Amino acid sequence: DVCTDTPRDFLEYGGARELALSASCPEAGRLIYRNKEKMKVVEKEISEPFPWKETEDEQVLADEILFARNQAITILQNRSICVEERVCACLEYAKKVQDCLNQDSIVDIHKIPTEPYFYDTTDVEKESESEEKQYGLFLERMRLFSSLESIRTEWDELLLRFQKRYMDSEEGRQQYIADRKAYDDMLNNVNREYEKEQLIVYYCFLCLARCVDDYDFLGKMKL
């Protein structure tokens, strides 16, 4: 009841109200990872009136963004290819959606062909992440995490362990690359790749619809 009444993620748009747990919540983590089946969003109609009336343009935007989010999630759940390829395909699709938003062609979002992203990835531009790029992205994330205000000592201790193990030395860089490879191999070898998929899909659900406010669909996909 507490999570329903005071959810960490709350969004109203297009005549709908979306409630969700923060992905950092232990209960959310249990729900995200407990099943191998593809994640689904549960919708139900309630009698409560919507607090305001959307304009026609706002409703069109909401409908198109919801459609695009659903398409992105479907691409990410295409288990015929590996998660990394699905992410690349989804980013390519997001670029097309962003082009429509930038060109004020919102009504054309649902016209974007999606077949290449579902069935054939040969035409999708892919950039293989080198070990150096992976490590560079890790350093960027660490700089961001270190700039956030901490509310728990456990977070400070975790960052410190990461810094000691992976940063400020060539040995740390090599250790990160080795640990990253071991982690990826572990997930793939024990059939746990679905865990990556579930988390990415959950964040897409949380973030993508929020572009109804700032029109930054691609930016939120990159998150």
What do the predicted segments below correspond to?
Residues V2-L91:
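Internal, well-ordered alpha/beta segment that forms a basic, Gly-enriched binding/recognition surface
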